[in-house]
């Protein structure tokens, strides 16, 4: 079974690493890691679920048209990617050149391809 999501769903999925050890695979596509205090939370806590595979994908131009904390979305995402890579056994981390709402089908296709390879389907 895999659990994950896009945007806030991706944030929620990654948050679950810190509260449950039930999922063998968690994914986040364009996770909203800019959410206030999320990076600090990840730094201050260790995942409960260290044995699951984690798939992370964010865009390098997410938040580019904003002037608030969303403008730094790629920076927050990079911090979370690095933290999760250090804290979890198996983490795939990728950044693409797109904005938050761009090329969603391509992003889900990339995840599907990775999942097929991971689970040898």
Regions found by a protein language model. Name each.
Residues 12-16, 37:
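Hydrolases whose catalytic domains are alpha/beta-hydrolase-1, hotdog thioesterase
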Residues 32-50:
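Flexible "cap/lid" loop of the alpha/beta hydrolase fold
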Residues 55-60, 74-121:
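C-terminal catalytic histidine-bearing segment of alpha/beta-hydrolase fold enzymes
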Residues 1-2, 25-27:
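Residue in the alpha/beta-hydrolase core beta-strand immediately N-terminal to the catalytic nucleophile
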Residues 63-75:
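Short, flexible/disordered intra-domain loops and linkers
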Residues 27-35, 59-62:
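Active-site nucleophile loop of the alpha/beta-hydrolase fold
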Residues 4-9, 13:
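Gly/Ala-rich beta-loop-alpha elbow adjacent to hydrolase catalytic centers
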Residues 15-25:
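Conserved hydrolase catalytic core segment
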